[in-house]
């Protein structure tokens, strides 16, 4: 795969100016975290404001962790999201009930766990591979173990976990993911993006 075709999602957005800068850089997707325990959590009210000027062909992804069905439906009704990303222990039945394209994030320690998730979430748009950690659900800055990813997975996968400007080219060269998802690697502090880091991250991928 040509690294120039790697799709990029920048996650944990909380500010309009960071979203706009990401759009100017050419990212494919913006992630909003709807999880009160996260330092990057956004309310529905804030989400409505910061996504107001997102143009066509930039996907809005709602990131959720073991949410109530009613809360997911509320987000779908209130925010123009293109994708749902489930980051907890949600079942395949739960994820598919909303008739919305979804990504299932997993935190595997073995190749068998990755293949099992691909089989279970057969109708997911993609599987997201993130680092197992007791520190939190994503955005930990801990690097994923690329060596456990099976070859020739039948489903597109998104690589996450500790990606930054220094390791992103090595990651995509070694793993050949469909897309990459970056959060803490482009931040000044949780939820506040560093525009220089954002630029360097994109330049490392696309030149």
From Swiss-Prot:
GO biological processes: L-tryptophan biosynthetic process
A Pfam family that the UniProt record links to this protein: PRAI
Database matches in InterPro entries: Aldolase_TIM, PRAI_dom, RibuloseP-bd_barrel, TrpF_fam
EC number(s) on file: 5.3.1.24
GO terms, molecular function: phosphoribosylanthranilate isomerase activity
Record key words, sorted: Amino-acid biosynthesis, Aromatic amino acid biosynthesis, Isomerase, Tryptophan biosynthesis
Gene3D superfamilies referenced in this protein's UniProt entry, alphabetically: Aldolase class I
Keyword match Acetylation: no
Pathway field: Amino-acid biosynthesis; L-tryptophan biosynthesis; L-tryptophan from chorismate: step 3/5
Recorded catalytic activity of this chain's protein: N-(5-phospho-beta-D-ribosyl)anthranilate = 1-(2-carboxyphenylamino)-1-deoxy-D-ribulose 5-phosphate
SUPFAM superfamilies named among the record's database cross-references: Ribulose-phoshate binding barrel (SSF51366)
HAMAP family in alphabetical order: PRAI
Protein family: Belongs to the TrpF family.
Protein name: N-(5'-phosphoribosyl)anthranilate isomerase
Species in which this protein is naturally found: Legionella pneumophila (strain Lens)
């Amino acid at each position: 795969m040509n690294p120039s075709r790697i799709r990029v999602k920048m996650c944990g957005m909380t500010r309009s100016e960071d979203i706009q800068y990401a759009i100017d850089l050419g990212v494919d997707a913006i992630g909003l975290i709807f999880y009160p325990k996260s330092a990057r959590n956004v309310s529905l009210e804030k989400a409505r404001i910061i996504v107001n000027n997102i143009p066509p062909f930039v996907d809005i992804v709602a990131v959720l962790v073991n949410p109530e069905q009613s809360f997911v439906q509320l987000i779908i009704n209130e925010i123009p999201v293109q994708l749902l990303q489930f980051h907890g222990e949600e079942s395949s039945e739960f994820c598919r009930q909303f008739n919305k394209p979804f990504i299932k994030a997993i935190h595997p320690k073995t190749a068998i766990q990755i293949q099992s998730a691909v089989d279970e979430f057969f109708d997911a748009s993609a599987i997201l591979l993130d680092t197992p950690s007791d520190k939190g659900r994503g955005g930990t800055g801990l690097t994923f173990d690329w060596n456990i990813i099976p070859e020739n997975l039948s489903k597109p996968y998104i690589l996450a976990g500790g990606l930054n400007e220094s390791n992103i080219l090595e990651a995509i060269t070694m793993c050949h993911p469909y897309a990459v998802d970056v959060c803490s690697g482009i931040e000044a502090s949780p939820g506040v993006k560093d525009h220089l880091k954002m630029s360097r991250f994109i330049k490392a991928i696309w030149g």
